[in-house]
Swiss-Prot record:
Transmembrane segments: none
Top-level enzyme category: transferase
UniProt EC number: 2.7.4.6
Listed GO MF terms: ATP binding; metal ion binding; nucleoside diphosphate kinase activity
Designated gene of the protein: ndk
Xref: Gene3D superfamilies: Nucleoside diphosphate kinase-like domain (3.30.70.141)
NCBIfam families named among the record's database cross-references: PRK14543.1
Entry GO terms, CC: cytosol
Major location category of this protein: cytoplasm
Protein's name in the database: Nucleoside diphosphate kinase
Subunit structure: Homotetramer.
CDD domains linked to this entry: NDPk_I
Taxon lineage: Bacteria, Pseudomonadati, Spirochaetota, Spirochaetia, Spirochaetales
């Protein structure tokens, strides 16, 4: 069984719009288990640990990195870890395409956001796409310890766990 943990962050635009409950319920309804959660105001140092300069600049640009740091810094976010069978892929599917205009209806981004990269770049701000989710297992393993200590990640059983994990 490929049981994984992955990091999710309801970004400032999602928090300001009151979407935390809507986002979390999408994951819980499919059987993913929340094993850690916290709401906090992100300082610039934490933002820079999460959004690695070299990675973002290589894939996008320095302007995109700067806008990400500015967007998430000094703003409230709700960050959480979910666990489940192949949870990284499941979470990415439920989130939808990173660029909201490409996200299909029924996904978090498809239902709650609509901006495009072009519009965001022209305006000089980060894309408002409600949620961050680890892209792959390596990212999840790097990101989770940035946001959570080991003792903040819980191990418990949901009542319906055997329905999802074939106990």
């Amino acid at each position: 069984m490929l049981l994984q943990k992955t990091l999710c962050i309801v970004k400032p635009d999602g928090v300001r719009r009151g979407l935390i409950g809507d986002v979390v319920s999408r994951f819980e309804r499919v059987g993913l288990k929340m094993v850690a959660a916290k709401m906090l105001i992100v300082d610039e140092s934490l933002a820079k640990k999460h959004y690695l300069y070299d990675d973002i600049v290589f894939r996008h640009s320095e302007a995109v990195w700067n806008s990400l740091i500015k967007f998430i810094s000094n703003s409230p976010v709700f960050t959480f870890v979910v666990e489940g069978v192949e949870s990284i892929e499941v979470v990415r599917k439920l989130c939808g395409a990173t660029e909201p205009k490409l996200a299909i209806p029924g996904t978090i981004r498809g239902d709650f956001s609509y901006h495009s990269f072009k519009y965001s770049n022209e305006k000089g701000f980060s894309i408002y796409n409600v949620i961050h989710a680890s892209a792959n297992e390596a990212d999840a393993m790097r990101e989770i310890p940035i946001w959570f200590k080991d003792n903040e990640i819980l191990n418990y059983k949901r009542d319906d766990e055997c329905e999802h994990y074939y106990c």
